């Protein structure tokens, strides 16, 4: 799935296609203050896919992540599905 696909398209494919198990997919994004300023969440922690962002659940709170901050989407095994 690598290439010039938009992150939104990749997120929707993971959610709807059945090609991937959401519990086996991690999303890496820029998050100031985290180690190397990168945080990751399981795809199952995504509460909502929006046009230009995702909403995640983190420590019992919702967090807004714009698409431009997403750096990489990968399987837990390390295989990259999409990267910036």
Please state what every model-predicted region is.
Residues 2-61:
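N-terminal recruitment modules of adaptor/scaffold proteins
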Residues 52-84:
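Short, compact, well-ordered microdomains
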């Amino acid at each position: 799935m690598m290439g010039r696909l938009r992150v939104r398209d990749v997120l929707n494919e993971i959610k709807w296609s059945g090609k991937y198990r959401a519990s086996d997919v991690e999303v890496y994004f820029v998050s100031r203050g985290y180690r190397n300023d990168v945080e990751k969440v399981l795809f199952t922690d995504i509460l909502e896919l929006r046009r230009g962002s995702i909403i995640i659940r983190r420590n019992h709170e919702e967090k807004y992540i714009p698409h431009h901050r997403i750096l990489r989407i990968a399987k837990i095994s390390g295989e990259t599905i999409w990267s910036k």
